[in-house]
From Swiss-Prot:
PANTHER family: GLUCOSE-6-PHOSPHATE ISOMERASE. It comes from Saccharophagus degradans (strain 2-40 / ATCC 43961 / DSM 17024). The keyword Isomerase applies. The keyword Cytoplasm applies. InterPro entries: G6P_Isomerase, G6P_Isomerase_C, Phosphoglucose_isomerase_CS, SIS_dom_sf, SIS_PGI_1, SIS_PGI_2. The lineage of its organism: Bacteria, Pseudomonadati, Pseudomonadota, Gammaproteobacteria, Cellvibrionales. It is found in: Cytoplasm. Its EC number is 5.3.1.9. The gene is pgi. This is Glucose-6-phosphate isomerase. One of its GO terms (molecular function) is carbohydrate derivative binding. HAMAP family: G6P_isomerase.
Length: 547
């Protein structure tokens, strides 16, 4: 079967490609020089965020062509399908109703009723633990809460908990364990008191290898430190759809919180999976986080595409990936507390859109999901920004910044923000050889020195970026930011005609990992495995034969 091309999807694709070729000869600097109102025209605000997308390789014709693509992809109709609960996850025949997790007002659907009941139950638990009413097996107040989960049960809650550090109530300390590497849980429990520790086991199936093994280790640690079997229920809560498995583990049925099939793991932080967030910042702030996301849902549903933040973010990334040949994007939050955001968005984007077949199963002949990476500013300036400025690869960037800080060190926040803006400006304008030569001449350097050094000081510029601003990092603005990226991912999936809500590649990795572990346990290595895999397993078996 012949692979699907974008020309098969979009009748004006030749015009889009021709326009992309024309942009190869243009510069952003010239675009700004020609239009004093460019920044104002290419900025849009909603839900406490402002997106400045003026430093992108676009003009009015670009946007017109991209809106044509969106129209042919039926993006507006697709948005309605997502938000009303149509089965947009076609390979698993499910809706993707993460927006229902943050509904506001009175419940309107059965899903809303389930969400409200779970939130009410969560609120009672958190109040009980924070107040000291909930006690451990020695009758002491819980001081530490440990979330055991991986992927969507870890990255989102961990990121949000770190991001909202200024809002921590201080009632308990929240920790996270994800890795199957025992070093993580071993190191963590060395600093905890078993009698005052509560574990949250977050696994929809209650069978995820990493989560189950870490939970078994946590249970053994409790038992080894004097907790009786019949007291374990005071130290374990589960978020799972498999109540019977959680009860068999030793968790009281009333302490099992639901997660539903209509929520994907990487979209689930708004549910009971977000319990560690609520333990850290309290239910009021958790609900503000949900409210911020709901405001972005409303914007996504109602705003025209040309003024729609998530749609524009998706269309711009489509432009770079599918038209201008980029295969990576950088997320650079200039906020220390957002240091885990790139890792969270890495999963959100790459697990969602790392697909190579259309929704109907046809191979694609075009690039889909891009590689997402980054770190917090200004740290990245002293590591990988060199490549962004002078490397041969064009990397579209999202700069994220706050206008105000939570801390009193205003002068440091000034420098943080200044560096964010300066980086986006420098990447756009660059520095030509004549300017570099003039600077060196002013420094008294000889013509010979200038000729030798000048080429190394040239910065080509013309590197694109978005800047996303918020007044302050709060539960509301963070909720809106995350929802914007969720909907950006969906927009891209619609434009590429792929399913953004399954993850069969992850499932294959889990299966093969189990097969290799069995081979290690039995020393029965299948002869039809490749020689590399056989050799690696033999080396591990030999190294551990006496343990």
């Amino acid at each position: 079967m012949q692979a699907k091309t974008l020309a098969d999807l979009y009748s004006d694709w030749d015009k889009v490609q021709a326009h992309a070729q024309a942009w190869q000869k243009r510069t952003l600097k010239d675009a700004f020089d020609a239009d004093r109102n460019r920044a104002a025209r290419y900025s849009v605000g909603a839900a406490g965020l402002e997106l400045d997308f003026s430093k992108n390789h676009i003009d009015d014709e670009t946007l017109q062509l991209l809106m044509g693509v969106a129209d042919q992809a039926n993006l507006k109709a697709a948005i309605k399908k997502l938000l009303r609960g149509d089965h947009v996850n076609n390979t698993e025949d499910r809706p993707a109703l993460h927006s229902a997790l943050r509904f506001q007002g009175k419940p309107q659907t059965a899903e809303h009723q389930e969400v409200k009941a779970t939130l009410d139950k969560m609120a009672k638990l958190i109040k009980s633990v924070h107040s000291g009413e909930w006690k451990g097996y020695k009758g002491e107040k819980i001081t530490d809460v440990v979330n055991i989960g991986i992927g969507g049960s870890d990255l989102g809650p961990r990121m949000i908990t770190k991001a909202l550090t200024p809002f921590h109530t201080g009632d308990v300390k929240v920790h996270f364990v994800a890795n199957i590497d025992g070093a993580e849980i071993h190191d963590l429990t060395r600093g905890l008191n078993p009698s005052t520790t509560l574990f949250l086991v977050a696994s929809k199936s209650f069978s995820t290898l990493e989560t189950l093994e870490n939970s078994l280790t946590a249970r053994k640690w409790m038992l080894d430190n004097g907790c009786a079997q019949d007291q374990l229920a005071k130290h374990f809560v589960a978020i799972s759809s498999k109540v019977e498995k959680a009860v068999e583990f030793g968790i009281a049925a009333e302490n099992v919180y639901p997660i539903w099939d209509w929520v994907g793991g990487r979209y689930s932080l708004w549910s009971a999976i977000g319990m560690p967030i609520a333990f850290a910042i309290g239910m009021d702030n958790f609900n503000k986080l949900r409210a911020g996301a709901a405001a972005m849902d409303d914007h996504f549903a109602e705003a025209p595409l040309e003024r729609n933040i998530p749609a524009l973010m998706g269309l711009l990334m489509f432009w770079y990936s599918s038209c201008l040949g980029t295969d990576t994007q950088a997320i650079l939050p200039y906020a220390y507390h957002l240091q885990l955001l790139p890792a969270y968005l890495q999963q959100l984007e790459m697990e969602s859109n790392g697909k190579s077949v259309t929704k109907s199963g046809e191979r694609v002949d075009y690039q889909t999901g891009s590689i997402v990476w980054g770190t917090e500013g200004t740290n990245g300036q002293h590591s990988f920004h060199q490549l962004l400025h002078q490397g041969t690869t064009m990397v579209p960037i999202d700069f994220i910044a706050t206008l105000q800080a939570h801390h009193p060190l205003d002068h440091q926040h000034k420098f943080l923000f200044a560096n964010c803006v300066a980086q986006s400006q420098a990447l756009m304008t660059g520095r030509d050889q004549a300017t570099s030569e003039a600077e060196m001449r002013a420094q008294g350097m000889s013509d010979e020195q200038i000729a030798e050094l000048a080429p190394h000081k040239v910065h080509p510029g013309n590197r694109p970026s978005n800047t996303i601003l918020m007044d302050k990092l709060t539960p509301e603005t963070l909720g809106a930011l995350i929802a914007a990226y969720e909907h950006k991912v969906y927009t891209l999936g619609v434009l590429w005609n792929i399913n953004s809500f399954d993850q069969w590649g992850v499932e294959l990795g889990k299966l093969l990992g189990t097969h290799v572990a069995t081979a290690i346990d039995t020393t029965d290595i299948p002869s039809d495995w490749d020689s590399s895999t056989q050799t690696l397993v033999k080396k591990f078996t030999e190294a551990n034969k006496n343990l």
